[in-house]
Amino acid sequence: IEQGFKTAVAAADIALVVTMPEISAVRDADKIIGELNRADKENILLIVNRIRPDMVAKGEMLDLDDINDILAIKCIGQIPDDEMVVSSTNRGEPVIANTKSQAGIAYQNITRRLCGEDVPFMTFRTKESFFDRLKKLF
């Protein structure tokens, strides 16, 4: 951990740890949480970024419960992997302003939670393929 991290942490009232639902990223987040604990920071919150519901459903990506079990800090938001983030970035527009973007809505919800509002977590559904729907018929 670099001195810049320690300097930033010293002045922080709140720490937002952002990770992705991958084992290596969660391990890194756990190390950061350990450093924050050693710095006597108590207000540590988690954001899980780039969630892919289809991969979670197949067991190829950690789900929020798995991540919470490992990190044991309060999760304040989950952000889906959303192609509209790339589109918005390429147009120079903030994705949070795009009301059709799942990620934009997730960012808005995180902001509202940070301001003290009680906002339910979004549920992300996987898109069923034609063959998945066909299988259900038989």
For the regions a language model picked out, list residue spans one by one:
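Conserved catalytic-core segment of NTP-binding enzymes
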Residues: I1-D81, V86-S87
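C-terminal boundary of histidine-terminating zinc-finger modules
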Residues: R91-I105
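A general boundary/transition motif marking the beginning of the first structured unit of a protein
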Residues: M55, N98-Q102, M122
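P-loop NTP-binding site
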Residues: K74, M84, I105, N109-F138
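Short alpha-helix boundary/capping motifs
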Residues: D65, P94-I96, L114
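Residue-identity detector for threonine
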Residues: T7, T19, T89, T99, ...
